[in-house]
């Protein structure tokens, strides 16, 4: 069905739903799951974290820690994961990885407002920028 599934990662409820669905799709089809997290453009990584530890749990900041947690979840169901920390706006980061990895599908979550689900700016921007199918959950 799919060889390459791309999903954005944050600690929001919508992103958690998107990751869960992307993980299900990847597991069912034997796809590689590409997990994208957006690193804000402001500033550089802290100078006190040596480069060899930048993307390990020893030097993990928020996005690094999140990617580690999601990798561990995917490993439990034998899904290959490629982590992509990208210094860009979330929609740009997802679209960039989707293009680079020739994604078959991108999975994004909806935002929520007072219990109702709505399509936020990031899913709309992703839909405008990618050339593959987009699943909004």
Positions of the model-derived regions?
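Small/aliphatic-rich secondary-structure junction motif
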Residues: 1-53, 129
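Short glycine/serine/threonine/alanine-rich loop segments
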Residues: 31-32, 79, 103, 132
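General small-molecule cofactor/ligand-binding pocket signal
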Residues: 34-36, 82-86, 135
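Generic structural signal for helix capping and beta-alpha/helix-loop junctions
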Residues: 42-43, 91-93, 115
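A short acidic, glycine-rich active-site loop
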Residues: 52-65
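Structural beta-alpha unit
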Residues: 55, 72-106
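Glycine-rich, Arg-bearing micro-motifs that act as flexible, cationic patches
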Residues: 105-129
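Short, acidic/small-residue loops that bind anionic groups at enzyme active sites
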Residues: 129-137
């Amino acid at each position: 069905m799919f060889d390459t599934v791309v999903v954005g990662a944050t600690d929001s409820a919508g992103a958690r739903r998107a990751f869960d669905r992307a993980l299900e799709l990847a597991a069912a089809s034997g796809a590689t799951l590409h997990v994208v997290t957006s690193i804000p453009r402001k500033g550089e990584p802290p100078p006190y974290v040596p480069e060899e530890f930048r993307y390990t749990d020893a030097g993990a900041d928020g996005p690094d820690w999140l990617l580690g947690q999601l990798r561990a979840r995917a490993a439990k169901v034998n899904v290959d994961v490629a982590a992509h920390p990208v210094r860009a706006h979330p929609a740009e980061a997802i679209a960039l990885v989707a293009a680079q990895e020739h994604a078959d599908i991108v999975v994004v979550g909806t935002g929520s407002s007072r219990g109702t689900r709505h399509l936020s700016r990031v899913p709309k921007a992703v839909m405008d920028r990618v050339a593959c199918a987009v699943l909004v959950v």
